[in-house]
From Swiss-Prot:
Its main location: cytoplasm. This is Ribosome maturation factor RimP. Required for maturation of 30S ribosomal subunits. One of its GO terms (cellular component) is cytosol. One of its GO terms (biological process) is ribosomal small subunit assembly. It comes from Streptococcus pneumoniae serotype 2 (strain D39 / NCTC 7466). It holds the Pfam family RimP_N. The keyword Cytoplasm applies. The keyword Cytoplasm applies. Keywords: Cytoplasm, Ribosome biogenesis. It comes from the Bacteria. Belongs to the RimP family. InterPro entries: Ribosome_maturation_RimP (IPR003728), RimP_C (IPR028998), RimP_C_sf (IPR036847), RimP_N (IPR028989), RimP_N_sf (IPR035956).
Length: 159
């Protein structure tokens, strides 16, 4: 595991328990933006998060990060508590199950029907298999995708 992945896991271990319902921890990213290191913690709730929510969560999360010993951060960083936005990542089976009926983007480790990327409506997620309806040029098609082949999945905006 590389240093950044280790930091993300350490952060997840201390942050996840303090984020209480109705909030949900969606993702954690740590990396350089410009010359600054940024720790981004993506949080959501059913009706969406507000600016006040992010301020309240920052007051809860920031002190908890200071309890990680030894300090895993190699340099100073900015803490960003934010919404995952319209193209929210679907990183768990529960997140995928919650996206049934929605328009999603799925990247695969291995091609199905010579395609490694599908974008369409998630019709079902049962027994570790996604069933999606997508457009192939002008025709609607359905594809079944084993969850084990999914490299990345996220909600998508239909244009």
């Amino acid at each position: 595991m590389d240093a950044i992945a280790t930091i993300v896991e350490l952060v997840r271990e201390v942050v996840e328990p303090v984020i209480e319902a109705p909030f949900e921890l969606v993702d954690i990213e740590y990396g350089k933006i410009g010359s600054d290191m940024i720790l981004s913690i993506f949080v959501d709730k059913p009706e969406g998060i507000t600016l006040n929510d992010t301020a309240d969560l920052t007051e809860i999360i920031s002190p908890v990060l200071d309890t990680i010993k030894p300090d895993p951060f190699p340099e100073q960083y900015f803490l960003e508590i934010t919404s995952p936005g319209l193209e929210r990542p679907l990183k768990t089976k529960d997140a995928v199950a919650g996206a049934v009926g929605k328009y999603i983007h799925v990247g695969l480790y291995q091609a199905i029907d010579k395609q490694k990327v599908f974008e369409g409506t998630l019709l079902a997620f049962e027994e570790d298999e996604l069933t999606m309806e997508y457009m192939d040029k002008t025709r609607k098609k359905t594809v079944r995708i084993p969850y084990s082949l999914v490299s990345k999945a996220r909600l998508a905006v239909k244009l």
